[in-house]
Amino acid sequence: MNKKLLMNFFIVSPLLLATTATDFTPVPLSSNQIIKTAKASTNDNIKDLLDWYSSGSDTFTNSEVLDNSLGSMRIKNTDGSISLIIFPSPYYSPAFTKGEKVDLNTKRTKKSQHTSEGTYIHFQISGVTNTEKLPTPIELPLKVKVHGKDSPLKYGPKFDKKQLAISTLDFEIRHQLTQIHGLYRSSDKTGGYWKITMNDGSTYQSDLSKKFEYNTEKPPINIDEIKTIEAEIN
């Protein structure tokens, strides 16, 4: 190899290597791009929360448990139809056995599915309880604050059931907050908490910035033993 060619090799080769390495090196996001991506993700999450909690729920009363297993339950309704209930957590199963009568608060997730056994309608669970009723309906003692200031209620959620699941209470409280107090409807009302205090001093609490975690579901509580329900939106 002559001197001129050798010199060109040593001069050009490092540049070629540098160019090749640059072609395969990912370009990091700028701080503005990272902020925009995080904001878009947050907005999608808030929209999902608003869609979920501002829409209505489905209620089944006096349904018969056909089978109950981890992650799902089949029930026979009073009109003879069969519904398949899908639990948000595959490890959750309420303590009811075949043949028992139950009330359910649910959210529809799929259209009807016709099978040889009957028509299945898929629902996502938001509470299973017994069918016991109260002599007179009870209004939940809900007190709401928005950014630290009282936000009065004309009326609170009212129930004639003796028991409610924590997940059902979560849905009903948040539904009220979205409809009356603007929860999830503006950028300054996307978080906070609700807290239930019972007469015996025990408490239940949920973070408003994310959906209720169904794997933390507790046994149903008697609503006539609720002392206070506080909700803070921020």
Curated annotation (Swiss-Prot):
It holds the Pfam family Stap_Strp_tox_C. Gene3D superfamilies: 2.40.50.110, 3.10.20.120. This is Toxic shock syndrome toxin-1. It comes from the Bacteria. One of its GO terms (molecular function) is toxin activity. The keyword Kinase does not apply. Residues 1-40 form the signal peptide. Responsible for the symptoms of toxic shock syndrome. InterPro entries: Enterotoxin, Staph/Strept_toxin_CS, SuperAg_toxin_C, Superantigen_bac, Toxin_b-grasp_Staph/Strep. Keywords: Secreted, Signal, Superantigen, Toxin, Virulence. GO terms for cellular component: extracellular region. It is found in: Secreted. The gene is tst. Belongs to the staphylococcal/streptococcal toxin family.
